[in-house]
Amino acid sequence: MAELVRPKKPKHRERPQSDDAPRIPDRPVMVNGMRLPVAPSHSIQHQRDRSASPEPEEQVLSDTGESINPEKENGSIQDVRSSPVRPAPPPPRAISQEREAPPIPARNLVFPRSTSMVAESTREPTPVVLPKRSVAVAPYPTVPELAELPSYTAALKHPQVYPAVDGGQLHHSRSAAAIPEKTRFSAPVAQERVREGEAPPMYPSINTYERNEHGLMTEENLVTFYHNPLYEHAEIFVDQFIKAEVVPNQSGSLFPLLARLKSVCDLMTVSEVKGKENTEELQKCLRECWVQQTMSVEAKGKCGDNNDGTGRASYFSYELQQSVLDQMKRLLSTNRTNLLDHTLCEETSFRSLALQIQWQIIIINNNFMAENGLTTNCPPSLVATGPMTPGRTAIRTALSDIFYHLRYPRLSKRFIDTLFGWIKELTCILNMRQSCDDGIFLLCHLLRLPSPIDHWAPPFVQTFIQSQSPPRLKLDYCVALLTHLLNPIKARESFLRHVAQSEKEESTWEILADDDDGEANEFSFVTINESDLTAFLDQIPISELYSIAYLAFTSYSDKGSQFTAMIAFQLLLMKILDNGLTSYSQPGYKMFCKQIGISLKHSVRELCSNWRLIRDQIRPGEEQNLQKEVDRIVLLALNYLIHRDSVGLFQFVVALPYGVVSEECRSRCEYALRSNKKMSIHEIYETPICEVRARISSQSIAKRVSSLGAQDSEFLINSLASIGSYSNGDVGQLLKELIDVCFCEPATRDDFYKCGGEAIGQILTKRPETLHQLLAIVDRNLQHMDSYAINVLSSSRLFECRLTEPMISIIGKWLINNPPEHGANRLARRVLSGLHWGLGPDGQNLWIDVDVHAIAADTVVKAHSVHCSRSNSMISKSISKISKLASKVGDAESLFQQFCWDLLVKLKLPTIPVDLVQNDLTAHYVRIVQNYEDDVVVYLEKAVPLLSDLVSSGSSVASVVLLSRLIAQHYQKVNLMAADKNFMATFERLLHIDQLPYAVQWLSGPSSTPTPIVRLICSAISYYSAKLPPRDYLRAWITLLCQARTGWNEDAVTYQIVGTIARIAFINDTQKLYEITSIVFQAYQQQMAAEKNQSKGILALFSSDSSASPLIPDSMLAVSPFASYIMLRVEQKSFNPFYGHFYETLGKKDKYNLDHAAKKAASKCSMALPVERLAVFRWAKLVIVCKDSALLPIILQQLAGQAYRLRKANNLNLCYARRLIDEPQMQGVMAECRKAIEETTVATKGLSKAVVGWLFTKHEVTRTGFDFSVFDLDYLLQLILAGDKNMWMDFVNMPHFTSEEFAERKLYSVTCQLSPKNRESPSPPELGSPRARGTAKPFPVLPVHSGLPKAPCLDPSTIFQQHVVLQMAAPFMSTVKNLAKQYTECGDRMDIYDDAYCKLIRILYQSTQQTVPVEIRCSYCSKPKPCTMTVKPNVLSPEIDVKMSQNRQKRIEFWNELNASMIDQAAVATASMEHLSRLVSMMAAALDPRNRNSVQPTGHSLFYLITSSVGENELLFSVASESYSHSLRALGEEFVKFRPEEQMDVMQLALNGFVLSEPLVEVFTAEVLNSDDLCTAYRKLSDAVRMPERSKMALQLLGEQ
């Protein structure tokens, strides 16, 4: 349909009507050069190329509908690859003969598109048409959002090395191919999109195409839907590439420069080695110049006994080694030579050559950009292959030259990095308008470079998926890249002949790598590295290929044809990937083969994912045929993967999309997996389906795994399970085989029990109804499974399974008859624990039948009574005995008991009257649930004793569940519960059940605050408060917790539970809190009354503290912010009479402090409060401990209100904020409060800062005319003063409390499985390949040459002006002359430094007078006499040592200055000189003969100007002499060679002893002289031969040497 969505051309054309539809054109025999894997035959069917639909502006319509292409025929390989589009499949004759062909409506009326897509449809380069084929470039719409990514559209800021292409500079380049097509025809199209039309079917139904006996389309017809000319001519391209590139033609301008650069780098490597050796020798020589020697001196005299004696003393002295010093002089001379003649000159030569090459590359890139109308900001784009233009030829030649020089052995890193930078620069420019052949050309070069190159080469291989090129062109290009990458690399050894020869000459090989089998592999740079191949393959992700394919095939008119094209593309892609597996199925390429396997798997999954989405949109008659094609692809992929030995591809068989294939295909896949014989796809299809199923039954898994490795066997088992999970047939036989092989057979189960569990998990996930079969099979084989039974369901998700009565009987047998540590018992627990015991998806009915719940409970009770006798012995025992019995319960029994309780609380048991009570804890639970929960009176009478036993035994979870259910059902009768002493005693013990060390902990790990059981109680309250009327339900809990208990306000557990209740009340009733404060108030009043009665006793007379106890102690404030908030509100309400007298006393006199007022108030009422118990300070303490609580804004409101609220005293409304807050004895509390508010992490929208300003200000806010604007949020403070008591809910994060509520509610719901099951089953994994994050590297970025010197530029007219050219060259020669002189002087100066250094070495050790101790002894001296002697040893002179260091430092500084001043200047000057000479020669060579002679004087003058500039210093400076030699060579080739008038002068110059005679000899061509001049020249040369000083040169000119 691509032709139907092109915009209408301005010129109106009408398509003539045809009486008959066009006949199907004959196709050539050979198409695409490929063998698509067709079953049952793979033979290549040859066919002719058919015509494609031409563009309107290119076609001439006739009655026969045939299009004629007026373009010239071109048989080159570039033309062959030019077609980026897919030819349209012709309609069959049978259909076209029955009706008249309908007229095709105008393009703009069919399928109108968005403006961006219309504009995109015009972005098509001019096609190059094949001989005898009409090819039209079809407009493929692109996705605008892909083309607008920053990596493609962001402008790059470059210096003016590459000039911008403006309107006034390159008008000559504005051809159809050069102008960006983005603006072409876009405006008219936008105006023509007026109405919508229904396009007639352009392609017939795919049912009309020929199929083989298996219902599969033939290769001939599949090629009709997808034809790739680039793939077809891949072999031809490679052959031509090898022919052209294996031997360099040296025609490029870069080749001689690169050759010189390589030589310089080689010399630099050698010089670097020599320099290091010289440095080491100098250091060694310096150490050996002075040698330490031991000297001795003898003394004679009298000893202490006055006898004649002698004494000897030894000392050290250093002696100069003259021979070593002479060697030092030679080494220093060598060092100077190495630094000057090698390091400096070679570095200068390197930079000079690199600069010349860089200038050449910029010229090449500028020519390419000008030729194609590009700028440096153009994004990458892919174009169809067209004729080779000069600019494209130059850039490819430059790349060839660079790649050639990368194929030498032992290249230096600097050389490689430099060449890589130039490849990057050339490729960046080429990417702006890269043809398909260019990309393949690059890949072919990269594949023939010495490995490894994976660290820099991959970015040069790109898919251009996000460019605005036509999708079909990009698709063909990517397929071609894959083809060249995965095919065997032809002639790699020939390209790397230099490397191979170097390796061959080495006498030994170094083993660098071992393969996975432990065998040593010889490493060779000629053999391509696996990492290189993997890196290139990563650049062509399968997901990107399919993204392009989806766009490329949208031109088909219907989904059937579109998907058929996808099938043809997929078959071709699979063939290419299989070629890669065939080429690299070797141990050294295992990871690469795995990467190919991943690509193959992803491609199949992508196709099947697309098929799953569109199969409902296919025509009714076509769906079955396309399903067969999908079956073929999956079966073919499986066959490719399982027949590659030792490369680890079996793992990818598991993930093939068996769910979208037919049942017959699944059977054939299973048959191929089970078979020990390698079968072709032909053999698999030829086997009848009945025979396939019979062979499946006869070929066991055990026999198959014996012929495979352990890893492949695991993947085989999982693959068979994956097929079985999607199968519609019975999987009983498969399950039996899995149980036998993986869990029963001793020889195999150690290897396969894990994968067996995974395989069974796959089956149960997709077919949960097979659980019954599985349990029956396991039950029959249980005695053979031993401890492996537990692994059967280790990876299974049983939430989707349902349990039936026969199944529970099997499980019950395992559970009761086997001890807890037995595998069968553990397996039974795994099944029962993994099931969903709650409601179904409808939320009304149970997922598992209620009768099964009752049977399961009965089974658990029986099992518990059998296996938990020690736990049951705790029933009706005292606490001390229970503790002793609990210590004897083993770990296995404890775990089993925990399982029983976890399961029982999930079961939904019906009400069944039972009179008999078993002496078992679980039976107690079941009896309570089934008999006593309906009537609270009966519950208190009969169930409470049973509940008490559960609590005493530590059955915490079950006890909490029973208590929660009771209060939820009978919360309206809470007073009956509160009045029952036994119930309240049990309730009290349950609240603290976590404190029992033997309690069955519901959560592992140490108890936290709150404890796990307290959290479960809080969760139950949250859950039921959402199901019941919350007011009465929460008040019932408050009644039990506070009103019915004594000492409750000193219990942390109570505050934790009350905190949950208060939070629920705060969320739903912010102001009144469901009036739970009234219940707490009554409880507190009762407590204070009891305390008051106790204070009337005799002991109260001896107590000085008459104040009432606080409702909540300070130590409990941090337990729960919500509980503390409620308690403080109740507490301040309880002391209202005290506060009335307190504030009245304060208002009488300002001198009264708080302590005095409190005492006065206590004397006037029956209650007393100390200052620290005042409400404002209690709220301040709560702020300190709750600074990070989300309730902080409300607490701050209470604090500010208590401080600033007006109090009525003596008929006046007074504010006591300053007197309260500034109380001296409470300054510590208030300072801590201020710090807590300032450090809070709660977002209070500025309230924290405002409250700090209010509380700690010095202003008296109640004075007349006070300006409240000095405060933040001053309106809130004014509301407090006005008596407003509304909550400041704007500052409270209510969603935080709500989320806490939902999270807390979930705990109890999950524990008891009270939530309905999810309506939707877990969706199968996505079939498509992952697209989240790719490993492909992005396009290379064009480098910026900010400080690059400019190259000499010549205008074409300048070369006719001799003086101008000479003036340009003169500065360069002058610079070289000065630098050469400086170079010579520097050598002399370094010589001076070295001479001075040697002289310093000679005097480094100097003779110094010293005294040494000597003892004079006689023969048997008992009293030696000490004395001293004077000696003169040579010792180190510190002053000389410092001077030597200074000498070396000055030499280093001088050398650094020399480098900085000379290298860059010399490099630029010599490079400019050579570049100018080369430029003059090239421009002269490009002139026609008439103008050429006019330029001869310019070249002649420049040539002899250079010869006259060569002096003594230039000859010593090798950089200058080499530069002059190459400049003379370049000029001589054009202006001297083969020119008679120049030969005599050149000969005479050479004979006169010109030192740089080599280029003169090369350009001396005497054969062009006339006879007289030739005789004269020969006579002069003959005479010169007889002269010793000229003999050698004369012979060279004569060609004798």
UniProtKB/Swiss-Prot annotation:
The biased composition feature labelled Basic and acidic residues covers 15-26
Q: Which UniProt keywords apply?
A: Autophagy, Cytoplasm
Cellular component GO terms, alphabetically?
cytoplasm
Biological process (GO) annotations?
autophagosome maturation
Q: Does the keyword Cytoplasm apply?
A: yes
| Chain spans, region Disordered | 1-109
Q: Where in the cell is it found?
A: Cytoplasm
Name the InterPro entries on file: Autophagy-related_EPG5
Summarizing the function annotation, the protein's role is: Involved in autophagy. Has a role in the degradation of protein aggregates within autophagosomes. Essential for starvation-induced autotrophy and omegasome development.
The similarity annotation says: Belongs to the EPG5 family.
Name of protein:
Ectopic P granules protein 5
